[in-house]
Amino acid sequence: MIGRLRFRLSKHFGAKNVLDDFALEVRGGEFVTFLGPSGCGKSTALNLLAGLLPPTSGEIWLDEERLDPRPPERRGFGMVFQNYALFPHLSVFDNVAFGLHVRRVTRATVADRVRRMLGLVKLDGLETRYPGQLSGGQQQRVAIARALVIEPRVLLLDEPLSNLDAKLRLEMRAEIKRLHQELGLTSIYVTHDQGEALSLSDRIVVMREGRVLQVGTPAEIHDRPRTVFVADFVGYRNLLPVTVTARGADGLVTAEGGGVRVRGRGDVALGASVLAAIRPEDVSLGDDLHGAGAARGTVRLVEYQGREYDVEITLDSGAIVKARTAATPKVGSVVGVTLDASRIVLLPAEDHV
């Protein structure tokens, strides 16, 4: 296992700054995810680490070795691509063995390592099949086996589950986590899916327009987003404009606006215009209108999600609140809405676009 991977990288395409002074240190054995929307620079960062793109400026260090001057094949990294990138004319065995042949590994060692890796990814018995004879999930397992068989110092995964259906995504997500833990890998994963990031990662790097907005554990990103963009991206679908009116000794901040009075957490100044961010699952519906965070509204939309319903309510003030509930409210009914103060995060409004 490596000690640490550290880098500081920038990348420009003409006048466009795709990656702006992206600096990070990854510890050996860590699973780090670059999370962000399309075009945020996350895949560019991964390609720079892999050596598939040259940086405009910056350095990559693995322990005491500088890697950025080296070609991809001399960095010791394994790469899993979004589109699998399997060779259609090669069998499963030969696809997995390809990197070992490039490294001139002996035939006996190749056979042993390929069979062991196919067993790890549960593809025993499929050695002679071709990619066109495999399901999407099986093709992805071949791609993962090919990246792992070279015993990479770092495993890079570029949105590897995006082409799979929902059921297969869940299965392969669990498989990737199992392999990471079982083999003691150091992994860097790219995705736009917050669910993947939260379930797989030791740390998450949230990115936007080539910049890092927040780095933290899944719990820190989920519970304590630092900006409105991060909050919105990881599921805080309610962003209510309010003004800070008081700070309590208990650490909670009181804010009011749009007919709503809320209490929540946040490093915000008295009198500041802020956004009260809260997830739909932390909004409850009922008749009780006592205390901060309570208001009355009318149900405008109900969407069935299996065990629960997504409900959109227009408050008497005109503000719109989204809730997730096990109850079955009717469109047009009047309900009480309560925002859980312990789950509200108050964030500066200036970065909301």
What do these predicted regions represent?
Residues 25, 61, 336-338:
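ABC ATPase nucleotide-binding domain
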Residues 237-239, 247-353:
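Non-catalytic connector elements of ABC transporters
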Residues 43-46, 142:
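ABC ATPase nucleotide-binding domain helices that frame the ATP-binding cleft
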Residues 50:
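Helix-to-loop junction immediately C-terminal to a conserved catalytic motif
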Residues 31, 70-78, 82, 86-229:
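ABC ATPase nucleotide-binding domains
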Residues 58-66:
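Conserved ABC transporter NBD signature motif
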Residues 35-37:
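The feature captures the beta-strand-to-loop junction immediately N-terminal to the Walker
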